[in-house]
């Protein structure tokens, strides 16, 4: 939308109960329902629908045809009040869908700050997405998935319900995971979702020095290459964690698992 264009296109439909900051822009044929709150500097492109209860922060961009805050796609949902919360600085591309939570799943779907969600991404009910993530085209998160910060998910990849994807992980194109993906881990580009080393390039880009990356590589080899039972691998990781906050975070992620760890 150009600077000289009207802030609210005359074909947009905005419920009187919606609360929009004074500089929010809304494009042609978009619908914003009741109990929607949108912060300053946010742009809603054409043909978007935003349903409440939904809270959206500042400086977000919904490019067009996005469906935000719709009812969860869960047969157990019975109309209870649930919500979607989106942070600041996110870019939501064409035909992205993000659903509200469910009463049985915590009641809230959360998207953090500075994420990029490319065309046809789907974020299901009760998902919790961190900050600085990139979801490529057709990324699919089933219900209750948790995604850490700086995660990159390639096109046509997805995660089974209740899975966790740790910070700085990378899922290759078409990767499907039905288990927890530890932080820093790369998942191969196939439907089996096999681990394929650590995300070294991504870590370098984010300022991890050689010493930190070396400690993470050692932890990965302990977990995936040494052939150890998980219980024994965790004991060795506990020793390594004494000298590395990154390994300590990796071990804490493993200890908190409720689903099987991807191995």
Swiss-Prot record:
<keyword id="KW-0444">Lipid biosynthesis</keyword>
<comment type="function">
    <text>Involved in the biosynthesis of lipid A, a phosphorylated glycolipid that anchors the lipopolysaccharide to the outer membrane of the cell.</text>
</comment>
<dbReference type="InterPro" id="IPR010137">
    <property type="entry name" value="Lipid_A_LpxA"/>
</dbReference>
<dbReference type="InterPro" id="IPR011004">
    <property type="entry name" value="Trimer_LpxA-like_sf"/>
</dbReference>
<keyword id="KW-0963">Cytoplasm</keyword>
<dbReference type="GO" id="GO:0005737">
    <property type="term" value="C:cytoplasm"/>
</dbReference>
<dbReference type="InterPro" id="IPR037157">
    <property type="entry name" value="Acetyltransf_C_sf"/>
</dbReference>
<comment type="similarity">
    <text>Belongs to the transferase hexapeptide repeat family. LpxA subfamily.</text>
</comment>
<dbReference type="GO" id="GO:0016020">
    <property type="term" value="C:membrane"/>
</dbReference>
<keyword id="KW-0443">Lipid metabolism</keyword>
<keyword id="KW-0012">Acyltransferase</keyword>
<dbReference type="InterPro" id="IPR001451">
    <property type="entry name" value="Hexapep"/>
</dbReference>
<dbReference type="InterPro" id="IPR029098">
    <property type="entry name" value="Acetyltransf_C"/>
</dbReference>
<protein>
    <recommendedName>
        <fullName>Acyl-[acyl-carrier-protein]--UDP-N-acetylglucosamine O-acyltransferase</fullName>
        <ecNumber>2.3.1.129</ecNumber>
    </recommendedName>
</protein>
<keyword id="KW-0441">Lipid A biosynthesis</keyword>
<keyword id="KW-0808">Transferase</keyword>
<dbReference type="GO" id="GO:0008780">
    <property type="term" value="F:acyl-[acyl-carrier-protein]-UDP-N-acetylglucosamine O-acyltransferase activity"/>
</dbReference>
<comment type="pathway">
    <text>Glycolipid biosynthesis; lipid IV(A) biosynthesis; lipid IV(A) from (3R)-3-hydroxytetradecanoyl-[acyl-carrier-protein] and UDP-N-acetyl-alpha-D-glucosamine: step 1/6.</text>
</comment>
<keyword id="KW-0677">Repeat</keyword>
<dbReference type="Pfam" id="PF00132">
    <property type="entry name" value="Hexapep"/>
</dbReference>
<dbReference type="GO" id="GO:0009245">
    <property type="term" value="P:lipid A biosynthetic process"/>
</dbReference>
<dbReference type="Pfam" id="PF13720">
    <property type="entry name" value="Acetyltransf_11"/>
</dbReference>
<comment type="subunit">
    <text>Homotrimer.</text>
</comment>
């Amino acid at each position: 939308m150009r600077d000289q264009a009207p802030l609210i296109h005359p074909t947009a439909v905005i419920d009187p109960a919606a609360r929009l900051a004074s500089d929010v822009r809304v494009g042609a044929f978009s619908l914003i329902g009741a109990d929607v709150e949108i912060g300053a500097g946010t742009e809603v492109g054409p043909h978007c629908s935003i349903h409440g209860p939904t809270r959206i922060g500042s400086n977000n961009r919904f490019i067009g045809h996005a469906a935000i805050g719709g009812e969860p796609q869960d047969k157990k949902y019975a109309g209870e009040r649930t919500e979607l919360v989106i942070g600041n600085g996110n870019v939501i591309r064409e035909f992205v869908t993000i659903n509200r939570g469910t009463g049985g799943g915590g009641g809230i779907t959360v998207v953090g700050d500075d994420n990029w969600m490319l065309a046809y991404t789907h974020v299901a009910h009760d998902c919790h997405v961190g900050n600085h993530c990139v979801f490529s085209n057709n990324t699919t998160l089933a219900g209750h998935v948790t995604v850490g910060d700086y995660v990159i998910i390639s096109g046509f990849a997805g995660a089974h319900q209740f899975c966790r994807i740790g910070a700085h992980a990378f899922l290759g194109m078409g990767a499907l995971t039905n288990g927890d993906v530890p932080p820093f881990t790369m998942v191969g580009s196939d439907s089996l979702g096999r681990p394929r080393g650590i995300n070294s390039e991504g870590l370098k880009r984010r300022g991890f020095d050689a010493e930190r990356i070396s400690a993470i590589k050692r932890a990965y080899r302990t977990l995936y290459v040494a052939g150890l039972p998980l219980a024994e691998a965790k004991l060795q990781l506990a020793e390594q964690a004494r000298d590395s906050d990154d390994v300590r975070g990796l071990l804490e992620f493993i200890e908190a698992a409720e689903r099987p760890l991807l191995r």
